Amino acid sequence: MKKKTIFLAMLIMLIGIMLAGCGQKETQPAIGIIGAMEEEVSLLKETADIKKTTEIAGMEFCEGTIEGKDVVIVQCGMGKVNAGICANTLINNFNCTKIINTGVAGSLDNQLDIGDIVVSVDAVQHDFTVEAIGFEKGEIPYTGRYAFPADEAMRKAAVEAVQETVPDIHVFEGRICSGDQFISEKEQKETIISNFGGLCCEMEGAAIAQACFLNDTPFVVIRAISDKSDGSHSVEYETFKGEAANNCARSVLEMLKKL
């Protein structure tokens, strides 16, 4: 009798678990798209068929579709902390299996003109240093690396999308350097170039890259050049950042067709 009672209790529990599972809707894989500023995501949000908006950590995560693809678009705010939190939330709360970071950047290489677009080969944090305790400049302790590589298939799709969307603009592939600073002095720029090389600098990409690396999630960073990172084009930054961000966003829209 006791065994029968235990069996019935276990059976009831199992049925309850199964019924609870049937009531849950599985979250479909999505592509996460991150921009730091409103100008960097406004076109994407206008184009998307937004189904739902959820606020987490002061950020609005907009779930919808673009070109038949499930996407989650979010303005994360400036800086590496915001960007890292945002990427991790997209991956773990919204089941994003790919992450795209779009926006503007300052050039580090003289061959880049304002308006040109950079697609990341990898990303580094130019302001991260623990050399005093034996690590290389920029190296993230206990990860064995300082540069986080972008996904090759996403890079290819991004380059093709730029070439097809804005064919009169040059597209480059290379390193993106990130730090919690707006680089506007020649000395700052030269230090970054000396330490890490790179094609452009901004404030979010490498944090997103590290979060994706830790979560084993493919990513790519796409940045349009808005200034020269040396203070010589401060007026141009305000004038062209909107256009540059828009060209980047248009390229992302085309890229989604290829993913």
Segments predicted by a language model, with ranges:
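Bacterial N-terminal signal peptides that target proteins for export
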Residues: 1-9
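Bacterial N-terminal signal peptides
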Residues: 9-18
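Short, conserved "active-site rim" segments that organize catalytic pockets and cofactor/ligand binding
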Residues: 28-48, 70
